Design a protein with these regions (language model features):
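Structural marker of alpha-solenoid helical repeat scaffolds
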Residues: 39-40, 73, 117, 153-156, ...
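Structural motif corresponding to the intra-repeat A-B loop/turn of tetratricopeptide repeats
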Residues: 23, 57, 91, 135, ...
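Residue at a conserved register position within TPR or TPR-like alpha-solenoid repeats
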Residues: 20, 54, 88, 95, ...
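N-terminal leader/linker segments that initiate helical-solenoid repeat arrays
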Residues: 7-49, 55
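Canonical tetratricopeptide repeat
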Residues: 45, 49-52, 83-84, 127, ...
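Residue-level recognition of tetratricopeptide repeat
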Residues: 43, 77, 121, 158-160, ...
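Single-residue signature of alpha-solenoid repeat helices
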Residues: 29, 63, 100, 107, ...
Length: 221
């Protein structure tokens, strides 16, 4: 009887944690996940949730700790490597340049492993596009490499492919090329994301307010 009660209590902790997490009540969810993990210390989903909560709270060291644990327990899971690389990348961004340099290779490796483990993993390919564009060429940044993963995204999702190419064009101030890519993405996707990218380009980069207003009017119909 006690075993059944304890099991129901622990299950209740996990379900409550999931519900609170879905409601974005992360700190409350953490209490329930911590309780559940104390009884089931190898439950990967719980550890992943705790990593996600740490990430939402920008506690990168804590997020890295959790994601490293789950990727070691299940090294074939692409998403675990992607999340580990993402948390490590955010820590690198907020660290001094010397400390960040020591993390760059591990960030890149984590994203690359994710792409190799899952040929359809969109998030890790997006991460590599941004990674290769944002880091200096002297430590591995490369538009050519970024375009490789933008092309892979194009094969998986036309919207993501055009958005990735538009992102690269905006970074290098090729705004007319970016307009073509963002328009293609918006024509296919017609989503809040595609609208916002094209609207921002018109308003803040091309300084074409009339186009921005027309786009907004059509999107909000």
């Amino acid at each position: 009887m006690f075993f059944i009660s304890a099991n129901l209590f622990s299950q209740s902790n996990f379900e409550k944690g999931e519900k609170l997490f879905a409601q974005k009540k992360y700190n409350e969810a953490k209490i329930h996940f911590d309780n559940y993990l104390s009884q089931f210390p190898l439950n990967l989903k719980t550890i992943e949730y705790l990593g996600d909560i740490a990430g939402h709270n920008k506690d990168w060291d804590e997020a890295i700790k959790y994601y490293e644990k789950i990727k070691q327990q299940n090294p074939q899971n692409a998403n675990y490597h992607y999340k580990y690389g993402g948390a490590l990348g955010m820590k690198a961004k907020e660290s001094n340049k010397f400390a960040a340099l020591g993390m760059i290779d591990d960030v890149e490796d984590a994203f690359l492993i994710a792409t190799k483990l899952d040929k359809k993993h969109i998030e890790s390919r997006w991460a590599l596009v941004i990674f290769y564009i944002e880091i200096p060429a002297i430590i591995g940044g490369s538009e050519t490499k970024a375009q490789v993963y933008a092309n892979e995204l194009m094969q998986l999702s036309k919207v993501d492919g055009y958005l990735a190419k538009g992102y690269i064009d905006v970074y290098f101030k090729r705004y007319k090329n970016a307009e073509i890519n963002y328009k293609n993405a918006h024509t296919i996707g017609n989503s809040k994301t595609t609208f916002e990218k094209l609207y921002d380009l018109y308003l803040n980069k091309l300084k074409e307010k009339a186009k921005a207003n027309k786009l907004k009017e059509l999107f909000e119909k």
